[in-house]
A protein has these predicted regions:
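Flexible, glycine-rich beta-alpha linker
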Residues: 122, 145, 162-187
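C-terminal substrate-binding subdomain of Rossmann-fold SDR/epimerase-dehydratase oxidoreductases
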Residues: 207-269
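NAD(P)-cofactor binding segment of oxidoreductase domains
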Residues: 65-67, 84-113
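N-terminal Rossmann NAD(P)H-binding glycine-rich loop of SDR-like oxidoreductase domains
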Residues: 4-24
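NAD(P)H-binding glycine-rich loop region in Rossmannoid oxidoreductase-like domains
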Residues: 49-92
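Catalytic helix-loop patch of NAD(P)-dependent Rossmann-fold dehydrogenases
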Residues: 91, 126-165
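Alpha-helical substrate-binding/gating segment
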Residues: 177-193, 199-226
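Conserved Rossmann-fold NAD(P)-dependent oxidoreductase catalytic core, especially the SDR/UDP-sugar
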Residues: 99-143
Length: 269
């Protein structure tokens, strides 16, 4: 049975990832401050991910218990801009990522998937995107401390994979994560389309995001790869043509947008 450490396994996306991985035969160990649901089937290790000593000890402890972990899924972070002061967002998120990835590499892990973010694309798009649908081809445009850290993580992954050609690091630029209970709010978005223009009306169901994590883990890719992860539609019932005409009339449109197709290109994924 393949063994994976999941950081942030008690969060919205993390819970779905743990469930998905356990269901598909992975042996899951969760590193987090908060325990995942007791019925998750995962082993829980309470930990402060900003403390490298704790992280390394836990990772090597997993190695001692299980021979070694086979993979790492890193989801733990301050989850969005504005939750805490900027300096805390920066210090927490960059140190957690470095600590977890560094400890995993020390334990011999070469299969790493981590949560990047759609915010790297220039959200909240106060400066309009260069074209729509947005994709992975244009350089990152971080507009917040949160997205700046995600940009640095992507750059770090590229260099770590250059150092070790056997290392795989896949960054998933998740859109706004939704759970089933969140769908009740979708009809209200039509009354105020401006409230969702910040991410081009995109979203990702936590269960679909979890599937993306599993498929990334199980892929035979090497090196670093970045993917936008969003659902195939928008949160709106208004057609894309109307939304673009109202909010982004001067932005280049590439291809057929469809009536409700996502404006966060998932073609690469």
């Amino acid at each position: 049975m393949a063994r994976v450490v999941v950081t942030g396994g008690a969060g919205k996306l993390g819970r779905a990832c743990v469930e998905e991985l356990v269901r598909h035969g992975w042996d899951v160990v969760v590193f987090d401050r908060v325990s995942p649901p007791s019925e998750s089937g995962a082993v829980f290790v309470p930990i402060d991910l900003t403390d490298y000593g704790q992280v390394l000890d836990a990772m090597l402890g997993v190695e001692e218990r299980y021979v070694r972990p086979d993979a790492l899924v890193h989801l733990a972070a301050v989850p969005a801009p504005g939750r805490v002061p900027d300096h805390l967002t920066f210090m927490n998120n960059i140190s957690c990522t470095w600590n977890v990835v560094s400890a995993a590499r020390r334990a011999g892990v070469t299969n790493i998937v981590w949560a990047s973010s759609e915010t790297v694309l220039g959200l909240p798009f106060e400066t309009p995107p260069p074209y729509i649908p947005v994709d992975e081809e244009y350089p990152p445009r971080p507009e917040s401390t949160y997205s700046l850290v995600k940009t640095l993580e992507e750059a770090m992954a590229a260099q770590l994979c250059r150092w070790n050609p056997e290392l795989k690091m896949i960054g998933l630029r998740f859109s706004n994560v939704m759970e089933p209970a969140d769908y009740a709010r979708f009809p209200s978005f039509d009354d105020d389309a401006a409230s969702r223009k910040w991410n081009l009306w995109g979203y990702i169901d936590a269960r679909d995001g979890a599937q993306a994590v599993r498929l990334a883990l199980e892929s035979d890719l090497t090196g670093t790869e970045i993917f936008i992860i969003a659902n195939a539609d928008t949160v709106m019932s208004r057609p894309n043509a109307d939304l673009i005409k109202e909010f982004y009339p001067d932005v280049e449109v590439r291809g057929d947008l469809g009536e409700h197709d996502t404006l966060l290109s998932i073609e690469k994924a």
